[in-house]
Amino acid sequence: MSRPNTRNKSKRPRADDCESPSAVFKKIHSTGAITKGDIKQLYMVWKPVCHGCHGNSKDSPNCFCGLIPAANGVRKSGLWQRTNEIIRALGPNPSTDLRDSTETPAGLTNLGATCYANSILQCLYMNTSFRLGIFSLEPDILKMHPVLDQLARLFAQLHSSKMAFIDSAPFIKTLELDNGVQQDSHEFLTLFLSLLEGSLSHSKVPGARTIVQHLFRGSVSHVTRCSSCGRDSEASSKMEDFYELELNIKGLNNLEQSLDDYLSTEALDGENQYFCESCQKRVDATRCIKLRSLPPVVNFQLKRYVFLPKTTTKKKISSAFSFPGQLDMGKRLSNPSSSYTYGLSAILIHKGSAANSGHYVAHVKDESNGQWWEFDDEHVSKLGLHPFGEKPGKSSDKTDQKPQGSSTADSVTNDDNNSCHEAAFTSTMEEMFSSTDAYMLMYKRIAKDENGIESNNISSNNSLPHHFVDEIDERNTSYVKECEEYESKKDVHLAYITERRQEVKSVLTEAPATPEEDSYFWISTDWLRQWADNVNPPSPIITGVRVHSSIDNSPIQCEHGKVPASKVTSMKRLSAGAWHKLFSKYGGGPTLSSDDFCMECLKDGAKNSVSADVYRDRKASLRSIAEAALAGNNPDGPLYFVSRPWLTQWLRRKNVDIPSDADSGPTIALTCTHGNLLPEHASGAKRVTVPEDLWLFLYETSGMKIDDIVTFPSDSQPCGICSQQLSVVASVEDNLRAVKLKQRQSHEKLTSGKSLALHPGQKYYLVPSSWLSEWRAYITATGKNISSLPEPQSLEVTINSLICEKHSRLLQRPLDLVCKRGTITQKASNTDGLTMISESDWILFSEEWNVAHGKGLCAEIVFSKSSQDNLQSSEAVPILVEDLDQSTNDLSNDLGGREPYVRTDPEVCEECIGEKESCALVEKLNYQNEDIQVYLVRGKEAPKSIREASAAVPVPDRRTSKRSRRTTSGNSISLKVSGSTTVYQLKLMIWESLGIVKENQELHKGSVEIEDDFATLADKCIFPGDVLWVKDSEIYENRDIADEISEQKVVVQTEEGFRGTLLTSSASAQLCQDISFSD
């Protein structure tokens, strides 16, 4: 059973009565009449209306498939793209920045590197007492103090703005802060409170005037006590104010230990004894800090950074540090009290490993409901009842407590560099938290009533000051209006999109006209596609308020203003109903109906079609004649010259309906500049004779003007001028060929490039290897290349350039000697050094190149009396030791240990050569961003192949094989280095790539170990392309390369801090200075 034929199942069956366009045009040409059936065939009206094609078919004017996507389909752009993409094109939606409610805190914009200020401002704002103090300021005071004014406005917006985040730019600009420089948040808080304290002192409102001192200021005293008499020093009674307590955390695990360390007693003994006024002598004593009073809000500054004297930089301490949810500070006072219990109210966090970079966020507790919030610039996240987020499996309205005596506690973990957990506790029901990034802790005193029960004494008067109400309302109104305008704009646009889609679907549904319909209209496919696919079609005209596109049918019109059959693939056949819908709305045109087919174009098409058939048939009939002409078989009769390459290409071209540009100029390549026939031996002038019939066809279809075509009958004579010129050139080439042949024969061994066997006692002459290489290439060039290579430089000029003017000695050395199998030769080179030639060759060179025989550079092979003598001879060129074999050793033994070397006349000028080589070496070592290769060797010793590659001397401009860089084991790396790169920097690169700490790296070039970390690669003669190898000694433990880089920074920028801002002006200047010294 045969299988069904499925190869053409996707093709539409052609109607039985359909003729090909070529047949229809032939009929029109022969009869001169155009029938209705002919129009249906040529305009493809007969094709059925299709449904469900994969794409729009150009071959059918009745196909409207693919102009819009399928049902529920989308496109990447235009009218049919996804709705969210259309909305995105309208611009950002301001409603996305809408604040849920005033119960949800608002964020602050980061202007580049102002996260340190944002975090502090959020901590201050969330402190209700501080916020009320700022809100109670008089308008006159705000006008007098711009910083207070901007702070109050910022707090007012954080309080009542409808936006989810507030622009902090006006406040930052007023403080004159550089928003591109990261600063220390602790330093900012200290200076900012000092600035506020001075500005607030002008207020007459008691709650505002001393709000900073009341909330944040406590007092301490430094007590020095004599161990002999037990008396305190006079200075011990002096109390000093503090706004935060700076606690060490290095080597300490929790807040209790840090407080113990802060209040610990220091012994003054030995050389550090104290002079007691009472005892009137130096005695042992103790010194400690005593807390005299505590403010309602205690700020603990954790010293996360340590100073590295070696690099004058700061390094962050990233160890975990624990702190409690409640803290009893009463026992820490010099006069203990039970009413000083503090609750954790804010945590300032520094994310990042470096001291001068990273990011600040704040976790702050809402005093009104106990909820914790994370403030990360513009983003504010609810954390629940725990400062680092809710516990797994616990509801947000319950805290986790353990009874007295419990040994463990549940853990709360935050993996975002904050590793927070609850630690063990034994004395009270409390929570402990731990963080590797906590930078500052804020604790607020817990108020208790007379019965000892915690009370919330937050004032209910938390409304916005009246002088900010109008401003905030105006801002909110403007913002709400902006949101409403956007929503309105979006609704209008989406309604328009929906309307346009319905319109397109409606028109395209009605668009197809059946083949039987006599009334239809033509429309440009390009315009229809753009109209169906674009939101706003191009070429606008205004109708009402919406811009529409007028119909443009000009691309499918012929010069007679009608519809040509040749444009049928660029237009569609619309039903009358669909056309009237489009035309009534968009206008334009011109209107092209079913009666607007072009009779003139149809007749021209019929004529051209017949002409194409004639051209195709004539060319096919003449192909055999052209093939015979190329084979040299021409019939009797007149013959004409054409270009042989041209005719070959003419035969290879595929059959086409009309002549192409390639058919022009069958004799152009045969025509000289004088308009005559080129001699056949001229370049590109190969020709062939063709019969007259073929020539006339080529002549008529050449596409050139009649006057531009040059005809050459077979009896045409070549151009006399060109023939004479070619004869001269041929004569010169013949003479040159003879000269080169003679030199090749005279210098047969030298031409072959074989090494010359050298014998002691014979006289030789020296020629530059580079000149000899050029001469060899010159005399061996034959055929078409005989005159292409230039003649080498004059030998006399070359010889003269080898003599230094200062000492009249040689500026180059002879090539090294090689002794193999008892024969002495020179090392081969095409570029460097001097090559020795025989005396006979030099005599011939003297005659051939017109050089005086006496100008030759003489050389001979001599033997040293001893190896030491050889090394001391400046003009001696020793043999290569690595090329010695057994025969050489035997020869050396026969000569009593003497070695051969080259003695020259004149002598080699070692002084000038040394100076030249030094300059070349310096230039070569002054490289930038070049590649070197480093191999990791495992085992006691590097393989021989790596050692040899590492010890090899790099050749200038040598092409390095790419294969040498490939490795399957991953033990080879390519590094970009410069001559100024230090060995230390190179070891860091190897550390980063291969993971070997620099102390364990045994780095070699060849067999020599590379030491001295401060030396440069130029100092160690490491060139571009060198191969190094490294071995891991495994003596020292692995560590992070980031630690090494941070500790070894050479360039350290001076920290400017807040210099040049309002924070360091007048009253704050001395405080800033004190902070700098303490750091």
From Swiss-Prot:
Family annotation (Pfam families): DUSP, UCH
Location (main, coarse): nucleus
EC number(s) on file: 3.4.19.12
Family: Belongs to the peptidase C19 family.
Function: Recognizes and hydrolyzes the peptide bond at the C-terminal Gly of ubiquitin. Involved in the processing of poly-ubiquitin precursors as well as that of ubiquitinated proteins. Deubiquitinates H2BK143ub1 of histone H2B.
Coiled coil start-end: none
Keyword Transmembrane (UniProt): no
CDD domains the UniProt entry points to: Peptidase_C19L, Ubl_USP48
Every USP domain range: 106-446
GO cellular component: cytosol; nucleus
SUPFAM superfamilies found in the cross-reference section: Cysteine proteinases (SSF54001), DUSP-like (SSF143791), Ubiquitin-like (SSF54236)
Subcellular location: Nucleus
Residue ranges, compositional bias (Polar residues): 402-417
InterPro entries: DUSP-like_sf, Papain-like_cys_pep_sf, Pept_C19_DUSP, Peptidase_C19, Peptidase_C19_UCH, Ubiquitin-like_dom, Ubiquitin-like_domsf, Ubl_USP48
Catalytic activity: Thiol-dependent hydrolysis of ester, thioester, amide, peptide and isopeptide bonds formed by the C-terminal Gly of ubiquitin (a 76-residue protein attached to proteins as an intracellular targeting signal)
Catalytic residues, chain numbering: C115, H359
Enzyme class of the recorded protein, top EC level: hydrolase
Record's compositionally biased regions (Basic residues): 1-12
Residues in DUSP domain copies: 495-598, 613-715, 738-862
Ubiquitin-like domain mapped to chain residues: 961-1037
Top-rank taxon, per record: Eukaryota
Protein name: Ubiquitin carboxyl-terminal hydrolase 26
Originating species: Oryza sativa subsp. japonica (Rice)
Region of interest called Disordered, as start-end residue ranges on this chain: 1-21, 384-419, 948-972
One MF annotation (Gene Ontology) recorded for this entry: cysteine-type endopeptidase activity
Family matches, as PANTHER family: UBIQUITIN CARBOXYL-TERMINAL HYDROLASE, UBIQUITIN CARBOXYL-TERMINAL HYDROLASE 48
